[in-house]
């Protein structure tokens, strides 16, 4: 017998069936109905019931459990299955316990998916049975359901596996992360060394211009009043701490500590120190304060500030994750941090005790990144020292792993490699210091980049102004690297020494809790302060307000649509070569319908999984609907819309665009590498839908002039963009998709990372995408407002049936 699971939104489902003359029992329990402190969540699509539960002990193993007592009607030998979520970047193992007996640890796998795993078998009596779920590893363990079954050979995965093309392992040809990494590497290999000074000078201008664009600083922001204010001052034996708040943009406040040495001549040389990803401590992180005070001991005035999302700016509306929202308007996290640094230099230059011709910049990790990107565009910097960042894009993308979105500038790999960015500094002094055991920025890439940059410095006779230092240590601003900063900056800004490391004196930093280290004495921004997210939203609204209206006259409207479509393609990285191919991986029967597993080729070396469901008794050529769902293509099994389409004789192609559903990969890693590539993941996914439509049109059993798309949830953005970019879809309907990308701008992010396409709002918002579908049927069903009745359940079905009638 095929005992496929059927589930509802209820607390549990009890099924009993007769097997070989004996009663067998199946008890399905939803973990969200267990008792315990694990957090109830719904943010990962594909769960059963009404949600799932997540342990919050990360990065420790929780000592709290989820517990439920249920009742078995029949005694017998029971298999205990656990359904939970696994992912490649997190250790999420669980352990089930039944009536005090702990079973095998499950979900050690590192593949991104919901999956049933067998925990063990045991003999159970009829009556009460207690089930306990334990955390068994250091990730965010996410438990969905428990199944106790005494049915012989019962496998809850058997039915699910039919709907999977890759039940055991995601192959390389379906791995969107691999695809984006390889595409990035192909671009980095195109960068060549300049053969002459003349060649470099010609290239230098374009590299500088493209860097400014990639950072989101083209045009330059206006240098508005800094409105600096000192909120506190504290005396120490050798220096004074000044707590300073300034505005890098109107009402956008930066919190900074200025350390002023006591004694010595003025005006002094100064150094801006930008911290790395010390999210809680920011400028006050222990290793960074040691570096700040070490520079003060050399005689520098030091300004250390909190980048967005760190230290005193670790507030709602300021997080690094909002950098995805910034991409929509053509801004970047790093561009904002670079501009904060430029304004910090403005502030230092305004002080009478600072020599504006002797200002330097340094930082580690994210601060090394800021040094790397700020120095080429800020000519007032007399010297720079970047630590634990400089690498090569090639080695960093290939071996460095996942990164914060602040490291990713849109399309930058199309225009430069890191050695060229370092070369923009020539002949000004620049030092790169790294840990040889740094897994994030492989040292081979650092050495290669600095060697290639040295050739550019040599063209200007400035080889002595460039230095690379590495130490046998992992990632971090360790003492040997801090000492390298002291010596390098002292040589070029103080005229002391030969640039070799200077021993760090014994330092006595304040306790982290000292109020003298904080600018916001009440922990709050000024009442009129604007957050990062607020600035992004305002820019989005400004861009949208400037869109030209769609012309009323048909000929002008056609020209408008053609121009806008071309601009969208250009913004999204260009239209790839057309494809309309697929390979069949077999068929199976489902409720009388025929289901064909298809791997649709959407790129020369990438495929996406799909299932073509042909209705029973179908005509020789049927219309078709491409089905997308946030929960993945398997959601077609329980979709009433799919059922209605099949009963009406319409085929359904349920597919997973790249990086989603069965093809899920580490989303931040994949989406951020797509940013570097200059082909946003949303645009790639829309291309998958376009290729699927083109493939369907080649099939003899599909009416090629009647291929529509339906999308439920956020994936409606994919369907809408696909319909806007291509006429291959004759109609489209979305249910629950955002009606504007302005809705995607918030902190925390309201949409998944794949939805944030760099620069797209400079071209068009969702209403303009829909306008490009004019003359084709388009339905956008939005979630009803509070208190409003929902739309009729069959409204979308009626729309699609009408849209797919023969013309």
Give the role of each language-model region:
Residues 1-5:
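N-terminal secretory signal peptides that target proteins for export/translocation
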Residues 9-18:
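Bacterial N-terminal signal peptides
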Residues 24-156:
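Extracytoplasmic
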Residues 155-254, 426-609, 613-623, 631-637, ...:
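Alpha/beta-hydrolase-fold serine-hydrolase catalytic core, especially in secreted/extracellular enzymes
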Residues 259-261, 274, 305, 362-364, ...:
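Generic beta-strand/beta-sheet core signal
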Residues 279-290, 325-339, 361-372, 396, ...:
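Alpha-helix capping and helix-loop boundary segments enriched in small/acidic/polar residues
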């Amino acid at each position: 017998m095929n005992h496929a699971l059927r589930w509802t939104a209820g607390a549990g489902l009890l099924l009993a069936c007769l097997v070989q003359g004996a009663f067998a029992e199946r008890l399905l329990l939803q973990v969200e109905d267990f008792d315990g402190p694990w957090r109830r969540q719904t943010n990962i699509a594909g769960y059963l019931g009404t949600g799932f539960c997540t342990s919050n002990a990360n990065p420790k193993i929780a000592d709290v459990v989820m517990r439920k007592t249920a009742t078995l009607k029949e005694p017998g030998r029971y298999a205990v299955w656990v359904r939970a979520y696994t992912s490649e970047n997190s250790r999420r193992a669980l352990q089930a316990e039944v009536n005090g007996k702990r079973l095998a640890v499950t979900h050690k796998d590192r593949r991104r998916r919901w999956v049933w795993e067998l925990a063990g078998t045991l003999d159970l009596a009829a009556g009460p049975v207690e089930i306990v779920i334990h955390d068994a590893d250091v990730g965010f363990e996410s438990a969905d359901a428990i199944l106790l079954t005494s049915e012989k050979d019962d496998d809850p995965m058997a039915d699910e596996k039919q709907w999977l093309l890759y039940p055991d392992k995601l192959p390389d040809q379906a791995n969107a992360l691999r695809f984006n990494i390889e595409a990035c590497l192909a671009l980095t290999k195109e960068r060549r060394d300049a053969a002459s000074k003349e060649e470099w000078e010609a290239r230098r201008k374009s590299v500088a211009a493209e860097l400014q664009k990639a950072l989101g600083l083209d045009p330059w922001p206006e240098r508005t009043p800094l409105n600096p204010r000192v909120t506190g001052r504290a005396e120490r034996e050798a220096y004074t701490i000044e707590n300073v708040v300034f505005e890098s943009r109107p009402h956008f406040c930066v919190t900074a500590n200025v350390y002023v040495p006591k004694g010595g001549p003025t005006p002094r040389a100064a150094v801006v120190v930008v911290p790395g990803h010390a999210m809680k401590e920011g400028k006050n992180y222990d290793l960074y304060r040691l570096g700040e005070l070490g520079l003060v001991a050399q005689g520098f005035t030091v300004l250390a500030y909190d980048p967005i999302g760190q230290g005193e700016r670790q507030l709602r509306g300021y997080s690094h994750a909002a950098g995805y929202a910034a991409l929509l308007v053509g801004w970047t996290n790093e561009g904002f941090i670079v501009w904060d640094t430029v304004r910090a230099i403005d502030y230092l230059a305004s002080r009478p005790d600072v020599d504006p011709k002797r200002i330097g910049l340094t930082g580690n990790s994210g601060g090394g990144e800021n040094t790397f990107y700020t120095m080429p565009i800020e000519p007032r910097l007399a010297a720079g020292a970047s630590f634990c960042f400089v690498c090569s894009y090639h080695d960093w993308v290939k071996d460095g792993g996942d990164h914060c979105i602040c490291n990713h500038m849109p399309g930058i790999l199309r225009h430069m490699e890191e050695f060229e960015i370092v070369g923009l500094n020539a002949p000004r002094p620049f030092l790169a210091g790294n840990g040889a055991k740094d897994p994030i920025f492989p040292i081979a890439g650092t050495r290669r980049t600095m060697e290639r940059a040295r050739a550019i410095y040599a063209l200007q006779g400035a080889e002595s102004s460039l230095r690379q230092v590495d130490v046998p240590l992992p990632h971090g601003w360790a003492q040997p690297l801090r000492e390298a900063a002291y010596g390098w900056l002292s040589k070029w800004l103080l005229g002391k020494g030969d640039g070799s490391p200077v021993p760090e004196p014994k330092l006595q930093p304040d306790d982290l809790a000292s109020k003298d280290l904080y600018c916001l004495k009440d922990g709050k921004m000024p009442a009129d302060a604007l957050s990062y997210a607020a600035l992004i939203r305002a820019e989005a609204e400004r861009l949208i307000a400037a869109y030209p209206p769609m012309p009323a006259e048909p000929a002008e409207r056609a020209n408008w649509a053609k121009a806008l479509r071309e601009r969208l393609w250009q913004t999204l990285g260009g239209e790839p070569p057309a494809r309309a191919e697929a390979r069949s991986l077999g068929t199976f029967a489902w409720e009388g319908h025929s289901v064909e597993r298809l791997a649709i080729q959407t790129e020369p070396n990438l495929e996406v999984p799909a299932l073509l469901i042909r209705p029973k008794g179908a005509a020789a050529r049927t219309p078709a609907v491409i089905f997308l769902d946030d929960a993945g293509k398997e959601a077609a099994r329980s979709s009433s819309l799919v059922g209605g389409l099949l009963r009406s004789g319409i085929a359904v192609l349920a597919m997973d665009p790249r990086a989603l559903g069965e093809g899920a990969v580490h989303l931040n890693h994949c989406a951020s590498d797509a940013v570097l590539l200059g082909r946003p993941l949303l645009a790639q996914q829309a291309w998958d839908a376009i290729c699927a439509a083109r493939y369907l049109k080649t099939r003899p059993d599909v009416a090629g002039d009647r291929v529509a798309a339906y999308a439920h949830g956020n994936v409606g953005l994919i369907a809408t963009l696909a319909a806007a970019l291509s006429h291959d879809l004759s109609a489209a309907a979305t249910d629950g998709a955002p009606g504007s990308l302005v809705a995607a701008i918030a902190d925390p992010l309201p949409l998944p990372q794949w939805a944030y396409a760099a620069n797209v709002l400079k071209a068009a918002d969702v209403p303009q995408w829909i306008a490009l579908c004019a003359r084709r049927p388009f339905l956008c069903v939005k979630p009803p407002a509070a208190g409003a009745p929902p739309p009729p359940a069959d409204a979308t079905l009626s729309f699609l049936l009408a849209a797919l009638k023969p013309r």
